[in-house]
Amino acid sequence: MNDGPDTNIDVPTGKRRIFGSISDVGKVRETDEDFVSVLKLSGAFGTVHILAVADGMGGHAKGEVASKLATKEMCKVWVESFSKIAVPELFNETDFESVLEKGIKKANEEILEYTSKNPEASGMGTTSVCAIVDDRGRVTIANVGDSRAYVISDKSGIRQETKDHSFVQGLLDKNEINEEEARNHPNKNIITKAVGLSPS
């Protein structure tokens, strides 16, 4: 799901981690189409935090429904996945990236099912970025669309860890434009992938 620089990041275990969320409707829209979830799961494996942000697509019907539905479905899958880990050995073998992708795929299916039953919501979708952080300092990230993950540290400052699925990112990847042109590009809001828009 993520084509970014590195989906697995080590955060030193002695460092303090802060998890939080804030959402603001902004000055353009009347409805906040964002939905955020922070889960803390504990078991035989220790403790993991699962973070998810879904940004309903502006201008599309029921973007706020898509983001809420996606986050709810992803969280259900993730809780179920970790509840099956009864011993630490199974946790060590758990592929966090596939756990995240499984949640995203389920969210995609649920949004498509919702739109098939509610034609007025046709075309609704959401972008998403999610991460699993375990108590050993392992961080795994997945994203769809242009929702981003950043790591902030004293050593490296603020570093973007995901790559957008967008028209402008495609131009950057082909070296057709530079970073400055990307920031001001007239098509910078066109995304190429989203949760809930196609079966794949």
How would you name each of these model-derived features?
Residues 1-200:
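PP2C/PPM-type serine/threonine phosphatase catalytic domain
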